[in-house]
Regions:
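Edge beta-strand at a domain terminus
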Residues: 29, 171-174, 178, 185-229
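Mature soluble binding/inhibitory domains
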Residues: 33, 37, 63-72, 78-112, ...
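Tryptophan-anchored aromatic micro-motifs
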Residues: 40-65
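Short hydrophobic/aromatic-rich beta-strand segments that constitute the beta-sheet cores
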Residues: 49, 102-103, 193-195
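Short, cysteine-centered beta-strand-loop-beta hairpins and adjacent loop/turn segments enriched
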Residues: 54-60, 108-116, 199-216
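A short, surface-exposed beta-strand/turn
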Residues: 66-78, 82-84, 115-145, 215-220, ...
């Protein structure tokens, strides 16, 4: 076989695999629009609770370990001198149009991990509470359970320090967490939201400029995990 023939054969094989993959995706079970609407109505509501906040900063030290977790994953780092705080009177609002609101999020907590700029940190410590908005979606998991996840939107803040107005943006993630709910409860209307819902602080920007990025809780560096429970 010539080199050109070999390359053509590889190209054809790659196309076949690509088309087969697309075909499998098209055949995968999906939730209907009616199901998604039913599930959104079932999950919608206002839920009272508290924020359990865990964070690491410059005082935190780390130890390498090899611990097998119940889910089979391996934990390779343990944080010492991490900090925790509980914020009462928190509220989670879930609407039936795909929105999720973490009410009364205390921005002062961000000052505990932002150390790139002392004036910025001070301004955050004096800022009041604000709502963090997210968008959620359902996805098919199996005939018994429905998957659910959300994506936090950037949180815009206008702060005044050094005699100037600064347009700050906080980026969050869902801490790579996914949730599963019994399909029969969502369909019957007997569902009650009881999941511990987590936000992880990812980065802080001024405009498009990255000021400071943060790690996951078991990583090296400043981090913050906020769990509504």
């Amino acid at each position: 076989m010539t080199r050109n023939s070999y390359l053509k054969a590889l190209l054809v094989m790659a196309m076949v695999l690509f088309l087969a993959s697309c075909h499998r995706d098209e055949d995968a079970p999906r939730l209907s629009l009616k199901q998604q609407q039913t599930f959104s109505h079932a999950i919608a509501g206002s839920y009272s609770g508290s924020y359990a906040v865990v964070y690491t900063d410059s005082l935190t030290t780390y130890e390498k370990v090899h611990e097998v977790q119940p889910d089979g994953s391996v934990k390779e780092m343990v944080a010492h001198n991490a900090h925790s705080e509980t914020v009462a009177d928190a509220r989670l609002l879930i609407t039936d149009d795909g929105k999720l609101y973490f009410h009364n999020f205390p921005c002062r907590l961000l000052a505990k991990i932002v150390d790139v700029d002392a004036d910025l940190s001070q301004a955050l410590s004096e800022f009041g509470s604000i709502d963090v908005t997210a968008q959620y979606k359902f996805f098919y998991e199996n005939t018994e359970f429905v998957g659910w996840s959300f994506e936090p939107l950037n949180l815009p803040l206008t702060l005044n320090y050094r005699n100037e107005r600064h347009y700050i943006r906080i980026a969050f993630s869902n801490a790579n967490r996914f949730y599963r709910f019994p399909m029969k409860d969502l369909e019957s209307g007997s569902f009650h939201f009881e999941s511990e819902t987590a936000l992880q602080v990812e980065a802080i920007y001024e405009g498009e400029q990255l000021l400071q990025s943060f790690t996951s809780f078991d990583g090296l560096g400043n981090s913050m995990l906020i769990t509504f429970k």
